[in-house]
Curated annotation (Swiss-Prot):
This is ATP synthase subunit a. PANTHER family: ATP SYNTHASE SUBUNIT A, CHLOROPLASTIC (PTHR42823:SF3). One of its GO terms (molecular function) is proton-transporting ATP synthase activity, rotational mechanism. Key component of the proton channel; it plays a direct role in the translocation of protons across the membrane. The gene is atpB. Signal peptide: none annotated.
Amino acid sequence: MKDLFLFSSLLDASHTFSYFFHIGLVALIAVIVAMMATRSMQLVPRGMQNLAEAFLEGVLSMGRDTMGSEKGVRKYLPLVATLGIIVFFSNIIGILPGFHAPTASLNLTLSLAIIVFVYYHFEGIRAQGFIKYFAHFMGPIKLLAPLMFPIEIVSHLSRVVSLSFRLFGNIKGDDLFLMVILALVPYIAPLPAYVLLTFMAFLQAFIFMILTYVYLAGATVVEKGH
C-alpha cells in the first residue's frame, strides 16, 4: 500500500500507525452507530434503531439455525454481533479512497480468530467439564484414541488459520483488485467494482459470524447419549 494515499499518512506514514489509526476509526464508527441506534428507543423502531434491530434479529436467526437452543443463541449474541460489526466496518472502510481496511492485515484477522478459538474452548469446558470435553477429541472407539486425539487437535488449530487467512486473503485481494481498477479506469468504470466489494464486505462478515456460532455449537451443544 505504499503507493496509495492514506489520510493517516498526513499524521504518520508508518504502517503501524496506519493500522492502529484505522482500527480506532472502526471502533469509533461502531460506537457512533450504537449510540445513534439506542439514543431514543421507540416501541416502533425507526431509522438506525430499525436497522440495528434487523441486524440483531438476523444474527439471532443465524444462531437458531446453527445452535438450536434459544438460550445459547442469546447468550453468545453480544460476541457474535460485535465480531460481525467489527469485521464489516473494517472491510467497508477499505473501499473508500484514502482509507485502508484493517482486515487486510493479518494482525487483526488472527487476533479475532484467536479470540473465537479461546472462547469456544472455554465455553465447551465450562459446559461439559474439562475431562468430558477433551474426551470427545478421542472419538467413540477407544482403540483409535491415540490416533484421533492428535488429529482433532490439529483440526481445531486449523480453524484459527482458516478463520484468519480466509478473511485476510479475501479483503487483501479486494484491496488489490480495487487498486488495479482505479489505476486503469479511475472514473465511471469502478462503480460496479464498488458494488461487488460492498457485497463481499457483507459476505465475509456473515461467514465469520456463522462460523463462530458453528464452533460454539460444536463445543457446547452435547447430543443425548454422549
